[in-house]
Amino acid sequence: MKLYVVPTPIGNLEDITIRAINILKSVKFIACEDTRRIQILLKHYNIEGKTLLSYYHPKEAIQIRKIISLIRKDEDVALVSDAGTPSISDPGFKLINACIKEDIPVEVLPGPCALITALVGSGLPTHSFMFLGFAPRKSQESFYKEVFSSDTGSYILYESPQRILDTLELISHIEPNITVAIARELTKMHEEYIRGNIKDVIEELKKRNNIKGEIVLVLSKENTLYQESL
């Protein structure tokens, strides 16, 4: 049998493919980071009778052996993330890698991905981009100096609302003219983009008493945002 890699909505529960729903209905086992999150989706689509396997860092090694054993026993297993496409900034890649090494078929479904949604909605260059995952908590200055030394169209990273202002202020000292797009609460009721020069975006955030929601940060040194149309 095989491992199915199934993307799930990043906010709006309607953002799931018919094929993904059919896979979740057909398998007996679903590997997930947080069983509570996937249960909300399963309940929404009336999918019942599934065995949920907690698959999260740092317990993934134990579960990998269990999941591979299930597949060897002719069971299909679906891998899901808390939101979006599995293996993007989550431990899913380790399971996929292990299955490939064991010659177990891996079938990846296309679907929601916060970084791509944010990049497209940012209006910043898409011809080349670098995904940085979650913003680092240590050695930030040296990290960003190294990152911005590369010749890349856009840079994308995930950041928390509590740290976004500090991160932008640090980056502004390294690249004072960089263009920024903050994508907040993507696909949800309060979805918002804040776009502009990094200094202007910082000033906008300072006006707000409380920044909430999941954030994707897109940056570009090409300064193409809102230039006059040809």
Swiss-Prot record:
It comes from the Bacteria. Transmembrane segments: none annotated. It is an enzyme of class 2 (transferase). One of its GO terms (cellular component) is cytoplasm. It catalyses: cytidine(1402) in 16S rRNA + S-adenosyl-L-methionine = 2'-O-methylcytidine(1402) in 16S rRNA + S-adenosyl-L-homocysteine + H(+). Keywords: Cytoplasm, Methyltransferase, rRNA processing, S-adenosyl-L-methionine, Transferase. One of its GO terms (molecular function) is rRNA (cytosine-2'-O-)-methyltransferase activity. Its EC number is 2.1.1.198. Its main location: cytoplasm. It is found in: Cytoplasm. NCBIfam families: 16S rRNA (cytidine(1402)-2'-O)-methyltransferase. HAMAP family: 16SrRNA_methyltr_I. Catalyzes the 2'-O-methylation of the ribose of cytidine 1402 (C1402) in 16S rRNA. Belongs to the methyltransferase superfamily. RsmI family. This is Ribosomal RNA small subunit methyltransferase I. It comes from Hydrogenobaculum sp. (strain Y04AAS1). The lineage of its organism: Bacteria, Pseudomonadati, Aquificota, Aquificia, Aquificales. The gene is rsmI.
